């Protein structure tokens, strides 16, 4: 089966928002629980929705913690977000070759648009599905299914590319092929345990993989 559609996660996959996310969590948690959380403590919070994460910490303060997080995140966005090598060129080439390309992210649309504009990737994507567009987040298949529906694409003709197990399992649940990125903050072995179909060392590795699949 040939591939004609590629879906990407955003944070940690297309743009390096790791420092922004970690700093936003530390700022928020230190505000409520002074000096109780260190950098390594917040790494597991990367991937799930803010609502899920803060619910487990204190269900009564979820909304105010999300507000605190987002305020810091927006204020420091442009200074803390970095590019990943070969991402721009690869996405540009996929578009040029006629692939349908989309983003499936657990972020809110406003912050997604900030990241895409900063990285100049906003011109390429046919569809962007955010947490604002769905009831369930990855690894539930709903966000991917929504993107596929909007793109008029079939799961068996689609790759899902991501840096977290939510992306890989989400792709598997939706019936797509899955691609893990080795630059995940959680380490290559962590993602390989979820048995993705392919692993990239850099984003441009995606192009020869697609050439091989589509022969």
From Swiss-Prot:
Catalytic activity: diphosphate + H2O = 2 phosphate + H(+)
A matching Pfam family: HAD_2
Cofactors (names): Mg(2+)
Protein name: Pyrophosphatase PpaX
Active site: 9
Keywords: Hydrolase, Magnesium
Molecular functions (GO terms): inorganic diphosphate phosphatase activity; magnesium ion binding; phosphoglycolate phosphatase activity
GO cellular component, one term: cytosol
SUPFAM superfamilies, per database record: HAD-like
Gene Ontology BP terms: DNA repair
Record family assignment: Belongs to the HAD-like hydrolase superfamily. PpaX family.
Assigned EC number: 3.6.1.1
Biological function: Hydrolyzes pyrophosphate formed during P-Ser-HPr dephosphorylation by HPrK/P. Might play a role in controlling the intracellular pyrophosphate pool.
NCBIfam families, sorted: HAD-SF-IA-v1, HAD-SF-IA-v3, HAD-SF-IIIA, PRK13288.1
Top-rank taxon, per record: Bacteria
């Amino acid at each position: 089966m040939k591939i004609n559609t590629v879906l990407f996660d955003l944070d940690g996959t297309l743009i390096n928002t790791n420092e922004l996310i970690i700093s936003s969590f530390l700022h928020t948690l230190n505000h409520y629980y002074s000096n109780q959380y260190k950098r390594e403590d917040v790494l597991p919070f990367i991937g799930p929705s803010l609502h899920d994460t803060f619910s487990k910490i204190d269900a009564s303060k979820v909304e105010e913690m999300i507000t605190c997080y987002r305020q810091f995140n927006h204020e420091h966005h442009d200074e803390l977000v970095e590019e990943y090598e070969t991402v721009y060129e690869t996405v540009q080439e996929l578009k040029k070759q006629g692939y349908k390309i989309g983003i499936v992210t657990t972020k809110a649309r406003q912050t997604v648009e900030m990241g895409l504009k900063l990285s100049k990737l906003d011109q390429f994507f046919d569809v962007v599905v955010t947490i604002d567009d769905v009831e369930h987040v990855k690894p539930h298949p709903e966000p991917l299914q929504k993107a596929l529906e909007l793109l008029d694409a079939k799961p068996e003709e689609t790759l899902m590319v991501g840096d977290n197990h939510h992306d890989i399992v989400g792709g598997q649940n939706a019936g797509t092929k899955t691609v893990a990125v080795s630059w995940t903050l959680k380490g290559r072995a962590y993602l390989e345990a979820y048995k993705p179909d392919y692993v990239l060392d850099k984003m441009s590795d995606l192009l020869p993989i697609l050439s091989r699949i589509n022969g």
